[in-house]
Amino acid sequence: MFLLLPLLESNNKLIDTLSSISEQKNIHQENIEVLIVDATDKTSGKIANGNMSMCKVIYAKSVKSFADACNLAASKATGKYITVCNCGDTFSDNYFESCIKVFNKKEKIPFVAGHRFCVNPVFREKKEFRLNKGQLESSVVNLFDNPNLINLELTGTFYRTEIFKSYKMNNKLKYESADDFALRIQLDYPEYVYLDEIEFDYFMPVSDDFMYYVPTNYKDWYTDSLNNFLKPLINDSKDRDGNIPLFIQFYIVFNITTKFLANMNNRNKRNMNDEELAVFLKQQENVLSLQMTVLFLTKTSMFLSATARKPPRCSI
């Protein structure tokens, strides 16, 4: 069991994360290795070394991004299973054991995901992740059957190490390197297991919530990411006939919707002048024109205006 923990800035929440790891049921600590990539002033790494023998620290002040930290740590990963978490993230005490049971039972499953909540004090109570799956008829999710059940968040998702290490995060993507990494794995492995009985609590808001974008005063996120991230993802996802998987189409709409969601916050309004806004609107129109199916997203569901042709299902 291998955990990657990037430290890009000093954070006093590290001990919370390490405590939740040490409290896992029926998992011996000698079977867990936590690799911390510390790009800070070494304070956080010292906290880890002083508290738990399962922690190893790489001091890498040259690391500037989440993608760089993950790539560095992944190159040194050992063990059968791997996940990533940030300072302040915690796991329910049955998380590791439940994931391992799935991997042992279903040998072809590439990764396991669970229920997610944001526990940042900016919210009055734990806030449920919008893309939580809830109670499903089957814990095995096939994205060709259920394209709205994409798994976007890299943190808290347990992968088979050999699969995780066969991909590399794109450190040229300033904002969506984790989404790109997760989706490219799902293009090759469209089935995974979702467990509603395990819980991952993350400290920092993520892309389903407008708080993630406060303050998102970076114009390149509105424009450059469409060209540098979404368009290459779309082109790489096409099959021989030029068809785009429906779950990638779902993500396209989700991604563009979040940009409008972010702009609902007063800090982001008037971030672009009229000419810049016109460029963004034209770019998102060009991206959406690549869609083969019209998707309408609501807070709780997805509606399709047409049924896309499904490729053969690969059963596990």
Q: What is each model feature region?
A:
Residues 1-4, 33, 180:
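Cell-envelope/extracellular polymer assembly enzymes that use nucleotide-activated donors
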Residues 90, 94-129:
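Conserved donor NDP-sugar-binding/catalytic core segment of glycosyltransferases
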Residues 82:
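Short aromatic/hydrophobic "clamp" motif used to bind/position activated sugar donors
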Residues 60-77:
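Glycine-rich, basic loop-to-helix element that forms the pyrophosphate-binding segment
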Residues 163, 167, 173-198, 204:
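A short, conserved alpha-helix in the catalytic core of glycosyltransferases
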Residues 21-59:
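Acidic donor-binding segment of Leloir-type glycosyltransferases
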Residues 127-149:
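Short, flexible, basic/aromatic active-site loop/helix in glycosyltransferases
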Residues 10-25:
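Short, well-formed alpha-helical segments that are part of the catalytic scaffolds
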